[in-house]
Swiss-Prot record:
Ranges of Basic and acidic residues composition bias in the record: 151-163
The protein's name: Class E vacuolar protein-sorting machinery protein hse1
Taxonomic source organism: Aspergillus niger (strain ATCC MYA-4892 / CBS 513.88 / FGSC A1513)
Role this protein plays: Component of the ESCRT-0 complex which is the sorting receptor for ubiquitinated cargo proteins at the multivesicular body (MVB).
GO biological process: protein transport to vacuole involved in ubiquitin-dependent protein catabolic process via the multivesicular body sorting pathway
Keyword vocabulary terms for this entry: Endosome, Membrane, Protein transport, SH3 domain, Transport
A Pfam family reported for this protein in Swiss-Prot or TrEMBL: GAT
Matches recorded under InterPro entries: ENTH_VHS (IPR008942), GAT_dom (IPR004152), SH3-like_dom_sf (IPR036028), SH3_domain (IPR001452), STAM (IPR050670), VHS_dom (IPR002014)
Domain SH3: 216-275
Positions of the VHS domain: 16-145
C-alpha cells in the first residue's frame, strides 16, 4: 500500500560510480556536488545513495563511491560533513572494511579516507563519531596500517648470486617469448570469442614485493603507503606513486627514482608492477590522441563564450552545451597526462643536471691537464755536439749560407742580411752561453741593422769586438765560469766581479778531469810568440797587443766561421780599442783544447774569463 519514496540522488550517484568507468569521471562527480548544494535535503539523500553503492560487490564501484564522498566533503561544507560523520555512514564503512571478501585496496582506501575526514572534522566536536570509527578500524585491522621500516642489512654474496640467476632466467624467458611470438596471433584469434570479465579491481594484477625478490627482475613499483624519510638518502613518496627501480642496496631496501629525486625505499611499502604490454601502450597513445583532438573544441568554446552577449542564455544554446560536455569529458584524461608528463619532466631535468655536472668535471680535468704540460726546454737552444758545425740555436737569426766552399773568412758586413726592425725579441736579454754560437748563428746583440751608425755600448755591458777580429782556432779554452745565466733575465753575472771561489757550485757544471787540466796548464806555459803565430795546420785565435791600436771596423756581427780550409790571406784588422775580452770564443771542429796564452804587457788579459 505504501511505496518507498524514490531517492532523487540514486541515478546521479549510480552514474558517477558506474562499474564500467575506467577512471573517476569528474563531470558526473561535480554534477552530484552541484545538486547537493542546490537542494535542502541533498546532503542526506546523497549519503543514503552512497551507502547503497558501498554495498555493491564490485571493487571499482566501492572505490568510486569513496572518491565521490571525499569530493562532497571538500566542496559541500558542514551539511555533508554532518551526514558523513553520522552513525549510518560510519557503520557502512566499518562493515565493508571488516568483510573478508572486500579487496585489500578497498580496505586501505577506507582507512585512508577515514583518517582524512577525522582530521577535517577535528575542529567540530559534534563530528566525533568519525574519529571513534577510525580508531575502531585501526584496532580491528592492524594490518591496514603502514608497516614499520625494515632494517638495513647488507646484501650477501649469496643474495648477489641469486639476483644474477634471476636476471639470467628473466632474459631466457624474454628470448623464449620472442621466439613464440609468431603463433601468438592465432591463439588470440581463437580466444577472442570468450567474454572478458572487466569487473575486477584495477590493481588485481599487482602484487606486493616479496622480501626475497631482487631488483634485477622488477622495473617499476607502486607505493602502497605514504613514506616520510627519517634518514638522509631515503626517497619520499605518497601512496599511488609509481617508482622506477634502479638497483638493490640493502636486503629489503631498493634504490629508485621519482619526480627527479633518487633514494632508497623499503620493499614493504610498495607493490610490484608488471611492465606495460603492447595493448596498454596503444591504449595510452589513443587516450593522448583523444585529448589532443579536443583542443579545437576547447578553443571554439572559448571563442563562443567570449563573443556572445551577456544576455544570451547559455542553457538554451545547444552548441555551447554540446561543446561544454564534450570538452569536460577529457578532464580526467588531461589530469592523468599532466601527472605523467610532469614526472617525465622531472626525470629529464635530473638527467640534464647530471649531464651538466659530468661536463663540468670533464672540462675542469681537461683544463688541469692542459695547465701542466710536459716540461720542455723553453728558451734553451739545442746544443750541437762539440766540434761539429751545427745549425743555429733556437731564438737566433739564421745566417746566410756561404756560397764558396773554399772561402774561409766571414763575408763583409754588407754581405750579411740584417734582421728586420720589427723582428721578434730573442730569448733573454743578456744570456751567457756554455759555448759560442756556430758559424750560422751570429750574435743578435752585436748585429745592428744594415746602415745603422755605430752605437757606444752601455757601461754595464761588456764590449763585444766584431767577428772580423776572431781568428779561427780548433782549440777551445777551459772556461772557469760555471754558472750559466737564467733565460729571460736582464742581469749579467760577471765572472770578474764574482769569482768562482765566491759562487756556489752549479749543479749542472761538468767537472774536468785532473789530467786534462794539467795538459791545459802545460800548454799555457808555452812561449807567447808560439801562441800568437798561426799553427801550420790550425790557426790560433785571440787578440794581440797590436790590435788595441787599430781603428774600429764595421759594427755588424757576421757569422762565425766553421770548419773550413786554412786561410789564404791575412784576416782583417781588429776593430775597437776595448780592453775587455769577449766571453764568446769561436767553436770549431777538430783537435783538442788549446788555451790562449796572454802577453806580458799592461793590457788586460783577453782570456781572463776562461781561467
Amino acid at each position: 500500500m505504501f511505496r518507498a519514496q524514490q531517492n532523487a540522488f540514486d541515478d546521479a550517484v549510480a552514474k558517477a560510480t558506474d562499474e564500467n568507468l575506467t577512471s573517476e569521471n569528474w563531470e558526473y562527480i561535480l554534477d552530484v556536488c552541484d545538486k547537493v548544494g542546490a537542494e535542502e535535503s541533498g546532503a542526506k539523500d546523497a549519503v543514503a545513495a552512497m551507502i547503497k553503492r558501498l554495498a555493491h560487490r564490485n571493487a571499482n564501484v566501492q572505490l568510486y563511491t569513496l572518491e565521490l564522498a571525499n569530493a562532497l566533503a571538500q566542496n559541500c561544507g558542514p551539511k555533508i560533513h554532518r551526514e558523513l560523520a553520522s552513525r549510518s555512514f560510519t557503520d557502512a564503512l566499518l562493515r565493508l572494511a571488516n568483510d573478508r571478501n572486500t579487496h585489500q585496496q578497498v580496505k586501505s582506501k577506507i582507512l585512508e579516507r577515514m583518517q582524512e575526514w577525522t582530521e577535517m572534522f577535528a575542529s567540530n566536536p559534534d563530528f566525533g563519531i568519525m574519529e571513534q570509527a577510525y580508531m575502531k578500524l585501526k584496532t580491528q585491522n592492524p594490518n591496514l596500517q603502514p608497516p614499520s621500516k625494515p632494517g638495513k642489512r647488507e646484501i650477501t654474496d649469496a643474495d648477489r648470486q641469486k639476483e644474477e640467476e634471476e636476471l639470467q632466467m628473466a632474459l631466457a624467458l624474454s628470448i623464449r617469448e620472442k621466439a613464440t611470438i609468431a603463433p601468438a596471433p592465432q591463439a588470440e584469434a581463437s580466444s577472442s570469442a570468450a567474454p572478458v570479465n572487466q569487473t575486477q579491481a584495477p590493481a588485481a594484477t599487482s602484487q606486493a614485493v616479496p622480501s626475497g625478490t631482487s631488483a634485477a627482475t622488477v622495473s617499476r613499483v607502486r607505493a602502497l603507503f605514504d613514506f616520510q624519510p627519517s634518514e638522509p638518502g631515503e626517497l619520499q613518496f605518497r601512496k599511488g606513486d609509481v617508482i622506477a627501480v634502479l638497483e638493490s642496496v640493502y636486503k629489503d631496501w631498493w634504490k629508485g627514482s621519482l619526480r627527479g629525486q633518487t633514494g632508497i625505499f623499503p620493499l614493504n611499502y610498495v607493490e610490484k608492477l608488471p611492465d606495460p604490454t603492447v595493448e596498454e601502450l596503444q591504449r595510452e597513445a589513443q587516450m593522448e590522441a583523444d585529448v589532443f583532438g579536443q583542443i579545437k573544441n576547447v578553443e571554439k568554446l572559448l571563442t563562443l563564450l567570449s563573443t556572445r552577449s551577456s544576455e544570451l542564455n547559455v542553457q538554451d544554446n545547444e552548441e555551447i552545451t554540446a561543446l561544454y560536455h564534450s570538452t569536460l569529458a577529457i578532464r580526467p584524461k588531461l589530469i592523468e597526462l599532466i601527472g605523467k608528463y610532469s614526472q617525465k619532466k622531472d626525470e629529464f631535468t635530473q638527467l640534464n643536471e647530471k649531464f651538466i655536472k659530468a661536463r663540468r668535471d670533464y672540462e675542469s680535468l681537461l683544463e688541469a691537464s692542459m695547465a701542466h704540460p710536459a716540461q720542455s726546454q723553453y728558451g734553451r737552444p739545442a746544443q750541437p755536439p762539440y766540434g761539429y758545425p751545427g745549425a743555429a740555436p733556437v731564438g737566433y737569426p739564421q745566417g746566410p749560407p756561404q756560397a764558396d766552399p773554399q772561402r774561409y773568412f766571414s763575408p763583409r758586413p754588407q754581405e750579411t742580411q740584417a734582421p728586420p726592425a720589427n723582428a721578434p725579441a730573442f730569448y733573454g736579454t743578456e744570456q751567457a752561453h756554455a759555448y759560442p754560437p756556430t758559424s750560422q748563428s751570429p750574435d743578435p746583440r752585436q748585429t745592428p741593422p744594415a746602415g745603422a751608425p755605430y752605437q757606444q755600448p752601455q757601461p754595464q755591458q761588456q764590449r763585444q769586438p766584431s767577428s772580423e777580429s776572431y781568428q779561427p782556432v780548433y782549440h777551445r779554452p777551459e772556461s772557469t765560469y760555471e754558472n750559466p745565466q737564467e733565460l729571460g733575465t736582464s742581469v749579467y753575472d760577471s765572472p770578474v766581479e764574482h769569482p768562482a771561489s765566491q759562487r756556489p757550485p752549479y749543479p749542472g757544471a761538468v767537472q774536468v778531469p785532473a789530467a786534462v787540466q794539467q795538459h791545459f796548464q802545460q800548454q799555457q806555459q808555452q812561449p807567447q810568440q808560439q801562441s800568437q803565430q798561426p799553427h801550420p795546420e790550425y790557426p790560433a785565435s785571440g787578440y794581440t797587443p797590436e790590435d788595441a791600436s787599430r781603428p774600429p771596423a764595421h759594427q755588424a756581427q757576421p757569422p762565425y766561421p766553421s770548419h773550413q780550409p786554412p786561410p789564404m790571406h791575412q784576416p782583417p784588422p781588429v776593430p775597437g780599442t776595448s780592453t775587455t775580452p769577449t766571453p764568446y770564443p769561436a767553436l770549431n771542429a777538430g783537435g783538442g783544447y788549446q788555451a790562449y796564452n796572454p802577453s806580458q804587457t799592461d793590457v788586460s788579459n783577453p782570456a781572463s774569463f776562461y781561467r
